[in-house]
Structure formats: C-alpha cells, structure tokens
C-alpha cells in the first residue's frame, strides 16, 4: 500500500469532550501540523461557552462553532419525514441524519482553510465512522481521512484520561458515564452500560427528554399540524419554520411521554446493538405526515413509496446521504409530496400519539364512494366482473392442478 503523505492541515470534528480533546493533542503530537477544530450545534443542548478557548488551549489553530440547527431540521429531518424513513421499522435515524450535515460543514471549512485532511472521533466498531467518511469521500475525495481510534495505541478510557492529564488538557471526568449518549434536534440516544444486556429494563432516571408515560398528564393534549408539500408549516395555526416545529413538538411530546423506543438494531458493520431512544418531536411528525398521505396519495403511489421508504432509511443509516441512489430516491420522495397538503389532528396522551382527524383540499377520500349507507356513485354489481377477471389466474391454476 502506498504510504500517505503527512498532512499539513487537519479539520477535526470536535466536541470538547474527552475523546476529541485527546485526539486534538494526539494529532499535534503525531503529525506536528495545524489542526482546526470544528463543532456543530445540531440541537445537542450542550454548553458551548468556553469551547473555543478550550480548543485553542488544547492546540487548535482555529475553532469553528456553527449553529446548524435550522439547516438540520430543514434539509435533513424534513426530507427524512417526507420519505417516511424509519430504519428496521422503528429507528427514526436521529444520529444518522446529523452526521452527513456535520461532515458537509467540515468539508466547507476544509475548502475555505485549504486543509488536506479530516479527522473524527468515531470508533472502529460503529456506524459513525462510515457516515463521516462516506460524506468526506463524496464531497472532498482528494483529502486524507485520519481515524485515530483505528490506528493509535490507546486501549480505552483510562489511557485517554492519563494522556489528557499528561498534556494538561482540562477534562472534567472522574468516572465513566453510565451510558453513551448522542443528542440532537431529532432524538437523544442511549447505549452501553446496563443496556448492553438486552433483557435489562432501562432505569427511569436515564430519560431526559420524556416523562414516564405513567406520570404524564391525565388530560390529553390536542394539536393541529398543517402541512404543505409534505412539510409541517404550522402548529395550531401558528406558522413556524422547521426548527421551531421540532423544538415545539419535542417539548409537547416530551411532556406527554411520547417517543420512547427500545430496540436491538443491525449496525452496518455487522454488529447487533441495543439502543434506547427518545424521539418525541420526530415521532409526532412522522405519524401525522404518514396519516395525511393516506388521504392524499393514490393507492399504488402509496404502496410503492412504502417499499422505497425502507431503502431510503437504509441508505440514510448506512451513511449514503450524498450517493447517486439517494439523490434519485429523494427526487422520487419529493415528487410524491406535491399534493400532501392539509391538517392532521393529533392526540397526545400518556406515551401515545394518536391521529384523531385529518383533512385536505387534495383529499382522495370520497364519502360518497365509501359510505355504508345507500349511495349512487358506486354500482356494486360492477364488482362481479372485476372479481372474475382479477381471479382468473387463480381459477386457471386450480383447474389445471387440482
């Protein structure tokens, strides 16, 4: 294998936590080059004050802190909702959606700064390494990628803490967190700790975004969500941008215990992983949007879209957001949304999100056709000829083989 040239300027995905703080110093030690730290605000609610100072004190030549929350909601969460993207029928893809946005922003910084390499803190066992690196390859194919967890000699957390102390890196860590967590506008995920045994029930004090359904209000909350072209544009008549919609639904859903999911999922690298997710806003949005499609899409389009939604979700989960097949799928999904306009009435109650009404000026639902009362639009005698033709292959097979 041809040896890679030593990098001269690296853009690092930086959070200020133990891993990326050590990586920053390690990159400086190992390559003796300039390192630019990049931090994205995607709704993680972490304290970003002091992050620039900490990054520079750890050795970064520059620290970028970008607020990407609106872009995340508008250009990543909303397209996923339009495409009904749910991985393995249950996971709403919060982390999977955030990584390509962060990597894209890093690519923009690399171009601006003339960097020749990227680095990230994802481990060699997870999906995030793939999501970051496929985006780098798609948007900046000529830049190097440095993944320290796949190359350095550190064995684990204790080694990182020792290195941080040696380098004078202020990492306020004394004991391991009970869980590995990732938070953004779409969700909060939990892995590790007692969750590694898939039979263990999560402890109630683990949850942050949602109250226990048993402790949720005894009175239901009703909402009306207005959609245009498949996107939620208003809640209870109040116009909102995608960021405001997500923040509002996260708050209301969380107060009613909506959006908890406990699953064992199949990682791209072949490992089964147990994850517990809190996705209050995303859950409400998905349920409302999917229901509105039931009256605005014709049967065949709806069924085909359901098939393709599984592919769509897999591509997102596997880090292929910027691939050709994703571009084509997004175009198809967006085309189907032309008439997904209307209002959905939602009831939130003790962990449940239930659609209790829907209406649209593009509704294909015709009460005159579907009524059980006497009607004039549908001639029931026409069904006999349809059934005879539709059942002809079955009848012929039975005639020959029985």
Curated annotation (Swiss-Prot):
Report the NCBIfam families cross-referenced here.
Answer: argG, PRK00509.1
UniProt KW keywords:
Amino-acid biosynthesis, Arginine biosynthesis, ATP-binding, Cytoplasm, Ligase, Nucleotide-binding
Tell me what reaction this enzyme catalyses: L-citrulline + L-aspartate + ATP = 2-(N(omega)-L-arginino)succinate + AMP + diphosphate + H(+)
Q: Which GO terms describe its cellular component?
A: cytoplasm
Named in its record, the pathway it takes part in is: Amino-acid biosynthesis; L-arginine biosynthesis; L-arginine from L-ornithine and carbamoyl phosphate: step 2/3
Q: Which gene name belongs to this protein?
A: argG
* Binding positions (L-aspartate): 123, 127-128
Entry-linked SUPFAM superfamilies = Adenine nucleotide alpha hydrolases-like, Argininosuccinate synthetase, C-terminal domain
GO BP terms: argininosuccinate metabolic process; L-arginine biosynthetic process; urea cycle
- Cite the PROSITE patterns for this sequence: ARGININOSUCCIN_SYN_1, ARGININOSUCCIN_SYN_2
Main localization, broad class: cytoplasm
Q: Mind telling me which CDD domains this protein's record contains?
A: ASS
Subunit record text: Homotetramer.
GO MF terms listed in the record are: argininosuccinate synthase activity; ATP binding
Protein name in the entry: Argininosuccinate synthase
- Residues binding L-citrulline: 91, 96, 127, 131, 180, 189, 265, 277
Pfam families in UniProt: Arginosuc_syn_C (PF20979), Arginosuc_synth (PF00764)
The entry assigns this protein to a family as follows: Belongs to the argininosuccinate synthase family. Type 1 subfamily.
Q: Which organism is it from?
A: Leptospira biflexa serovar Patoc (strain Patoc 1 / ATCC 23582 / Paris)
Binding-site residues for ATP, renumbered to this chain:
13-21, 40, 121
Enzyme Commission number: 6.3.4.5
Which cell locations does it reside in?
Cytoplasm
Q: HAMAP family from the xrefs?
A: Arg_succ_synth_type1
């Amino acid at each position: 294998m041809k040896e890679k040239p030593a990098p001269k300027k690296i853009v690092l995905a930086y959070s200020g936590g133990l891993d990326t703080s050590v990586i920053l110093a390690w990159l400086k030690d190992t390559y003796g080059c300039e390192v630019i730290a990049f931090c994205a605000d995607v709704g993680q609610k972490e304290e970003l004050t002091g992050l620039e100072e900490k990054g520079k004190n750890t050795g970064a030549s520059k620290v970028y802190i970008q607020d990407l929350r609106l872009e995340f909601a508008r250009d990543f969460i909303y397209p996923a909702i339009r495409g009904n993207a749910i991985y393995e029928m249950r996971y709403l893809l919060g982390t999977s959606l955030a990584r390509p946005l962060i990597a894209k922003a890093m690519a923009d910084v690399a171009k601006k700064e003339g960097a020749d390499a990227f680095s990230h803190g994802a481990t060699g066992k997870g999906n995030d390494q793939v999501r970051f690196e496929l985006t780098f390859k798609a948007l900046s194919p000529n830049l190097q990628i440095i993944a320290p967890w796949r190359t350095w000699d550190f064995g684990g957390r204790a080694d990182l803490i020792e290195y941080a102390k040696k380098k004078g890196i202020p990492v306020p860590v004394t004991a391991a967190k009970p869980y590995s967590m990732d938070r953004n506008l779409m969700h909060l995920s939990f892995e590790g700790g007692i969750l590694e045994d898939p039979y263990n029930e999560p402890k109630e004090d683990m949850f942050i975004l949602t109250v226990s359904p048993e402790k949720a209000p005894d009175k239901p909350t009703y909402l009306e969500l207005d959609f245009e072209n498949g996107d939620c544009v208003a809640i209870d008549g109040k116009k909102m941008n995608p960021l405001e919609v997500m923040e509002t639904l996260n708050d209301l859903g969380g107060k009613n215990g909506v959006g908890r999911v406990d699953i064992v999922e199949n990682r791209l690298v072949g490992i089964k992983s147990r994850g517990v997710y809190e996705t209050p806003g995303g859950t409400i949005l998905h349920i409302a949007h999917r229901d509105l499609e039931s009256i605005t899409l014709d049967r065949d389009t709806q069924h085909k879209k359901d098939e393709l939604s599984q592919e769509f979700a897999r591509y997102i989960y596997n880090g292929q957001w910027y691939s050709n097949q994703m571009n084509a799928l997004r175009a198809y999904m967006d085309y189907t949304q032309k008439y997904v306009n209307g209002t959905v009435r939602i009831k939130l109650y003790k962990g449940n999100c239930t659609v209790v009404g829907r209406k649209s000026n593009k509704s294909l639902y015709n009460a005159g056709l579907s009524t059980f009362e006497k009607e004039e639009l549908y001639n029931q005698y026409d069904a006999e000829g349809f059934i005879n033709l539709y059942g002809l292959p079955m009848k012929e097979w039975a005639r020959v083989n029985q």
